[in-house]
């Protein structure tokens, strides 16, 4: 199948769900392609989603870390979705809620067959915290490719930025081709073309081509 270019500006809100069980109820089965966005509560996840889709208010941003507690799903087209997972690791969130989030995130990564890739967003000034590593390990263990996106790269000088990028790449080298590392700035647009290229590739997995071919054969 020739890869078509996906217009991420067409993303529109589809549903919110409190956990993976409810997600299964709302979505039309575990089919098509989903790309998940995960990160600590202060990683700039909502800002990144808004920048990549060129929509100021697609994902709600908040000055209060930990506000996004739901799984929010955005539709690109009939077969493709972006999934904004709850922010994790915020210190002032009650422990019981933290554990519930972590369980929900783990279940989603391990059980969702249509998951084509995971973007793990990290503030470039504070990368690779324990929960970030856990998310990456969960995804790779499930054979899901990961983009480790180092956000807020405009906060560092070029030399410091590239030093951190290289350090993170070295720290994740054990995962081989399963993990890519890129700097990103929602404010400046740094890294946006590269990120969109990776997401576009993830939007065209072989299983989707097989699904569409089977649908055509059935008709």
UniProtKB/Swiss-Prot annotation:
Source superkingdom: Bacteria
One Pfam family per UniProt: MMR_HSR1
A molecular function GO annotation: GTP binding
Residue stretches making up the EngB-type G domain: 31-205
Residues that hold GTP according to the record: 39-46, 66-70, 84-87, 151-154, 184-186
Family per similarity comment: Belongs to the TRAFAC class TrmE-Era-EngA-EngB-Septin-like GTPase superfamily. EngB GTPase family.
UniProt protein name: Probable GTP-binding protein EngB
